[in-house]
Amino acid sequence: MTAATENRTVRRNGPGTKRADWNNWSPLAFEEMDSALNIQQYIQQTIKANPADVATILTPPLDQDEGVWKYEHLRQFCIELNGLALLLQRECIPETCQQMTATEQWIFLCAAHKNPNECPAIDYTRHTLDGAATLLNSNKYFPSRVNIKEISISKLGSVARRVYRIFSHAFFHHRKLFDEFENETHLCKRFTTYVSKYNLMQQEHLIVPILPNQQQQQQTTVQ
Amino acid sequence: MEDASQLSNSQNDKAKDETTRPQYTMSGILHFIQHEWTKNELDRTRWEAERAEMQARIAFLQGERKGQENLKQDLVRRIKMLEFCLKQERAKNYRLTHNGEEPPSLEESPNENSAPSENSHLTADLDAYINDAGEAGGSFRQGRLLLKRYLEEIGYSEHIMDVRSFRVKNLLGLLPQADLPSSERLNGRKEKSDSNYSDSDDGHDDAALDADASKAFEEFDFLNNMDAKEKGSDDDWAGKGASFEKLIKQYKDDPKVKRRSRTSTEESEEKTSNDVQKNLETDVPPGIRSAIDAAAQEELPVRRQGRRSANFGYGNGNELDVALGMQDNDNMDIKDEFKDEDDDPNAQQVKWNIKVTLRSHLDSIRAMQFHPVEPVLFTASEDGLIKLWNLDQKKDEKHNSGGTELEPVYTFRGHKGPVLCLVLSPTGDHLYTGGIDGNICCFNVPSSNGDPFDSYDPRVLTETLTGHTDAIWSVAYHSSNSRLVSASSDSTVRLWEPGNGEPLIRTIGAPKSGILPTSVDFVSTETSHLLAAYTNCYAQIIDIDTGSTVMVFDFGAVTGSPTMNKIVSHPTMPLTLIGGEDRTIRYFDNTNGSIIHEAIAHVEGVSSLAIDPNGLYLLSGSHDGSIRMWNMEKRSCLQEISAHRKKNDSAVTSVAFHPSRSLIGSAGADSLAKVYVSGSN
Ligand SMILES: [Zn+2]
Ligand SMILES: [Zn+2]
């Protein structure tokens, strides 16, 4: 092998990589990411750098196509939400959470079934995440990760709306678990910022008071 | 520039309500162009992959077409032959009724004794024979032409049959192969014995292939017997056939023309196969050699036979041409076809074509394995999930997924963060997965026909084996005592017994400080031995009963200290294969730890290896994005498929053979898994 190739940083988590060294390579400028999955790489790189820096994570590279940007972020949310689902598997059981609820105002029906079903919370969580993975991989709506069809963008909103209920259920029913997860990942904060920034959800549906302005709002309503 | 500004205009129109960005920055335009270029490049690679697939398909269909045309021609010629026969009978009748006018050589009485006298005449003088033909009229000449074609035809169709059976054998590699050549032979004979000329064929075969003389003589005898039974009323034709045969033999005995018909291709082919044999004899230790020889004996006769029959058809034409004083004419095109088929290495190879792309994971897939029996696949991904796929799944209308694509039947959740490896129990009932979280999850495998949106059953995850303090990169299952081995970047290899109260049985540290285990597999020929590969170009055999090193593989001189990514045991031989980050695949002899063979196999690091259940084919996957199918015996590459796109510098991460079906799979950093079927499906 030539010296040039050897000197090049190989960004690869090969077998034997320690957990601490996972994705632990010098960051690459977005312009230099020449793979087709550069947006996913870029998003994961900025998260790795600092998961709490939501603003930076959600700042697209210059002139980035917004559809792909939104799409890849939603993929990333679904990946990380698997972590929350794993935690919920521990204590969110049908005996205690017979329905998918957050506040008592709504019971959410699971849309993974042909006829929306009143699944227990843990099943709602699993079904919704599995359904989201299927939809985001659908050849019909998202045949390419480089180019998102305009008509498919609307699907992002419905996926976002459904997976958000997992946050809200965890927040209102498994608060300790939610905090444990949120402190590590800042995922709900990032998600709320994301759907607000791209108008994927209506503000009144964002019921987990995670952003400073939401907390203020809640306080004012309480008062 | 105009184009660029237009494009950025339109972009801006879209984004106008969002923000007011500088409209035409140079970097913006450049980036746009770069972006477009990347897109085009991507499309191009995809199109190229599709093109390659289509070409393989076309080649296969063309082969099919040739076979069909050939069959048609064969039937037409048979009809013509019967017509010719009838004409001959009429001519004979005429001659008998006009006795004296005809030369004695063509005077044929209906009884069998006439044949020898005719033979003696024919063998005496070639010219006389041709004159006879001239006197007998154009129909006789035409008949010989037909005969010649027909003989070629037999060779050709036999060749086609060989190609097919070879292909089938190749792709199956799963069927008892020893049967194939013999059954094929029988088919060939059947076809030959359908014809009255068969004895002349085989006589020719005998003479041309003196190496196989004795075997061919047996065939000859056998066919003569068969023919004798079948002759009946066609006696005179049989007689003519015999005379041809004598004529050909005489011709071949002529030193000037002897062997001229043997083409150089056959000689070189035989030479290479001899070389291969020789290499095997010198390179391979005795234990392995016998096994390889056994494999080779299954393999080679078919190839040789195919080669021989092609040549046979070829030579037949040539020699008959000369013997019968004919020039090459309209048969040229057939010969060209022979040649093409011979020269084109693809014609005799199995081609794997993509059957289905499995899209459901959201991040790089790290590992895949097929169910031992069912058309079922398991994939483990960095998205933290393991998915079960039923490749025969009927589209279920119950689900609101909006697509017609294959969806996973079950999704396993048990790991926090990426899942890096998985292994199934030999029955396919239990699944063991290792993750970056340092845990091993033991799952009961749910029904592959279940409802993907069934309610959660916590009993699916039966146990979590904790103890490793860092990522688990490889798990292997011991088929006979239900034990599990794991390799972790905490530098240890651990032996577990799931279901036991104290599942951890043994911890085996790294043989040297600073090296980490990467991959483990059990030795197929010695069940208490474990293969372990490490970073820093190290691999060894460990006795799992004692935890001690049995053998350290000798890598010889290696530049740098590349990580050995994947270690696999040959299914039947004491042979170990290791794929390395240095792009190399190495074959080791377990008996002495020495390298049998090493070769750079890919453009970038080899990430994964899989061997078919019979140990004849090797599948390798690499970060260059391709998977390659290898002939293990010849170590030649049979096919390359560009399979997966890169994420960072990773591409193909895992490859697999189905243990009992003609399916292979690949998985990659692009979150996709692909399943391929062999070309004939
Ligand atoms: Zn719950
Ligand atoms: Zn449901």
From Swiss-Prot, chain A:
One of its GO terms (molecular function) is metal ion binding. InterPro entries: MOB_kinase_act_fam, MOB_kinase_act_sf. Keywords: Cytoplasm, Golgi apparatus, Membrane, Metal-binding, Transport, Zinc. Its main location: cytoplasm. Zn(2+) binds at C92, C97, H169, H174. It is a peripheral membrane protein. SMART domains: Mob1_phocein. It is found in: Cytoplasm, Perinuclear region; Membrane; Golgi apparatus, Golgi stack membrane. One of its GO terms (cellular component) is Golgi cisterna membrane. Residues 1-23 are annotated as: Disordered. May play a role in membrane trafficking, specifically in membrane budding reactions. Belongs to the MOB1/phocein family. This is MOB-like protein phocein.
